């Protein structure tokens, strides 16, 4: 994924496929509903800890891949 808009769209798609509302997701991840709204909108100024909580609740595995040659 290249930017936060893609991340936000992905999170929204997964959330909806699981039948979870933004409010339900925010409660399960212990973040504010506004955070979920802004995340799904692709807002750039996100707190990484909260992002990781949301991804965890949705069962999304975040992987970091080293560049070739490192």
Go through each PLM region and give its residues.
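A detector for short, charged/polar N-terminal pre-domain segments
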Residues: 1-6
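Hydrophobic alpha-helical segments, especially transmembrane helices
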Residues: 16, 23, 34-35, 51
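Short basic helix-loop element that most often maps to the first helix and adjoining turn
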Residues: 9-28
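Short, charged recognition helix plus adjacent turn
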Residues: 45, 63-70
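DNA major-groove recognition helix of helix-turn-helix/homeodomain DNA-binding modules
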Residues: 49-65
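Recognition helix of helix-turn-helix/homeodomain-like DNA-binding domains
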Residues: 30-44
